[in-house]
């Protein structure tokens, strides 16, 4: 007898808990001692992708999916009513609603604490009521890449007393109640991630003192207006914020005094950007973009952060409040995502107002050139060239998505000339370079020669590196 087989059942079950349910089920053929031992494991990890292969025909795939669903049914039946800690089901081809609800009710009755569903839900599918009143759920994750997730229409009866983490991600998330009414239903929640959320009205409030680890909100807008009328945050103990939404007309309350990290995407369309760039006297008194300057209230509310990451659309919105930009005394890391059609008007104000900045990261060195571009770039000649850079104490500059163009090289030289405390510059090449010189070895050699010259001319350590991870909205 092998040493593992001689171990007690509870020890072998613990070993099996590190495997997927399919892998642990395969151990049943080892010997009688292993037969159906996997049914005692309190964690179920069921994934249809382990059964499917791209080369299979449609008929074969349907047959295999039916076999997978039958396997899930058998496993739950063999386990009986024993306690279960985790139930993870990934079936992106979908599950018949009646069957899925039967499984969910079964694991909820057995006291599941960690529930994960990655399924393309059918149109109109509603999760069972039992899920919204579970007394054992600690972590709940719902993901549907192409389908829509409907939070239970009777959500006023929701109460999940132990839920600490709620993660909902979908093409569209519908909730028939206001978020501020729903959050009290989770009295100990620490992490909230809602991706694809549609606000029920145009006034949004996120108020929760227990949120600490993370708040990720990615909204598709409001049912009643294009841009939210107001968005408020009262989360005094929150450490990490990732917020993506259409820019609101007002941010009347932003209480995030404990915030350590913020990633902000404030969406605007091309027409709104054109109006923001126009002279103020060209705008009517009731033009919504006049009120976009209220974004300064959001920035003041998060000004204690140490890590701040801003999307290219956000930079355009911030151009409406450059004069009133708050000072970010604690910011050590500033990240900027660039785009050809979005301007850098706000970048000089940001650099001036981060007096203790240590690391500056650009994802892309491209931007739309305007007469308000400021002195952070060298696109337009100015007598005070590089003034905002010369007052910036940044020590490390990271440049991602480098596309091997001379325009980028000129901007890199501009940084090297004007950042007085710069010690290190890391340049990461674009993985799929769209530029005409992306695969030209002569251009590569020229760029490498220029970078070697920089090392001789400047005290800064300049490195050309392989591609790295790109902007992460979460």
Curated annotation (Swiss-Prot):
Pfam families, per database record: F-box (PF00646), FBD (PF08387), LRR_At5g56370 (PF24758)
UniProt keyword annotation of Repeat present: yes
Record's keyword annotation contains Isomerase: no
UniProt xrefs under SMART domains: FBD
LRR repeats: 140-170, 171-196, 220-245, 281-312, 339-364
Gene3D superfamilies xref list: Ribonuclease Inhibitor
InterPro entries found in the cross-reference section: F-box-like_dom_sf, F-box_AtFBL13-like, F-box_dom, FBD, FBL60-like, LRR_dom_sf, LRR_FXL15/At3g58940/PEG3-like
Record keywords: Leucine-rich repeat, Repeat
Domain named F-box: residues: 1-62
Name of the protein: F-box/LRR-repeat protein At3g03030
UniProt source species: Arabidopsis thaliana (Mouse-ear cress)
């Amino acid at each position: 007898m092998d040493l593992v087989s001689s171990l007690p059942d509870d020890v072998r079950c613990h070993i099996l808990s590190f495997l997927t349910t399919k892998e642990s089920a395969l151990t049943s053929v080892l010997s009688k001692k292993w037969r159906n031992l996997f049914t005692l494991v309190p964690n179920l990890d069921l994934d249809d992708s382990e059964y499917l292969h791209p080369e299979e025909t449609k008929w074969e795939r349907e047959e295999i999916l039916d076999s997978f669903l039958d396997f899930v049914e058998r496993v739950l039946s063999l386990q009986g009513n024993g306690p279960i800690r985790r139930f993870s089901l990934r079936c992106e081809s979908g599950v018949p609603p009646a069957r899925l609800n039967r499984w969910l009710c079964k694991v909820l009755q057995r006291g599941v604490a960690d529930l994960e569903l990655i399924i393309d839900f059918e149109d109109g599918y509603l999760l069972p009521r039992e899920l919204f009143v579970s007394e054992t759920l600690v972590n709940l994750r719902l993901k549907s890449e192409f389908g829509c997730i409907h939070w239970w229409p009777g959500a006023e009866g929701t109460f999940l007393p132990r839920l600490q983490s709620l993660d909902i991600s979908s093409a569209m998330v519908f909730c028939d109640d206001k978020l501020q009414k729903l959050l009290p239903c989770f009295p100990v929640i620490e992490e909230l991630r809602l991706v694809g959320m549609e606000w029920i009205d145009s006034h949004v409030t996120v108020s929760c003192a227990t949120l600490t680890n993370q708040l990720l909100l990615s909204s598709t807008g409001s049912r009643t207006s294009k841009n939210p009328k107001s968005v408020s945050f009262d989360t005094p103990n929150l450490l990490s914020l990732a917020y993506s939404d259409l820019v609101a007309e007002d941010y009347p309350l932003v209480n995030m005094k404990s915030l350590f990290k913020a990633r902000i995407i404030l969406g605007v369309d091309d027409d709104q950007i054109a109006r923001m760039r126009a002279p103020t006297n060209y705008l009517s008194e009731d033009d919504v973009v006049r009120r976009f300057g209220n974004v300064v209230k959001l920035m003041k509310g998060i000004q204690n952060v140490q890590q701040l990451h801003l999307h290219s659309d956000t930079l355009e919105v911030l151009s409406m409040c450059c004069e009133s930009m708050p000072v970010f005394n604690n910011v050590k890391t500033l990240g900027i995502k660039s785009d050809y059609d979005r301007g850098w008007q706000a970048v000089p104000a940001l650099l001036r107002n981060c007096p203790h900045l240590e690391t500056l990261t650009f994802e892309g060195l491209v931007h739309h050139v305007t007469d308000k571009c400021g002195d952070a770039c060298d696109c337009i000649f100015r007598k005070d060239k590089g003034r905002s850079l010369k007052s910036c104490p940044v020590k490390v500059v990271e440049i991602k998505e480098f596309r091997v163009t001379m325009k980028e090289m000129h901007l890199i030289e501009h940084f090297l000339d004007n950042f007085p405390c710069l010690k290190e510059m890391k340049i990461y090449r674009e993985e799929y370079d769209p530029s005409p010189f992306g695969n030209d070895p002569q251009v590569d050699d020229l760029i490498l020669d220029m970078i070697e010259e920089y090392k001789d001319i400047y005290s800064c350590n300049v490195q050309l590196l392989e591609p790295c991870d790109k902007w992460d909205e979460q």
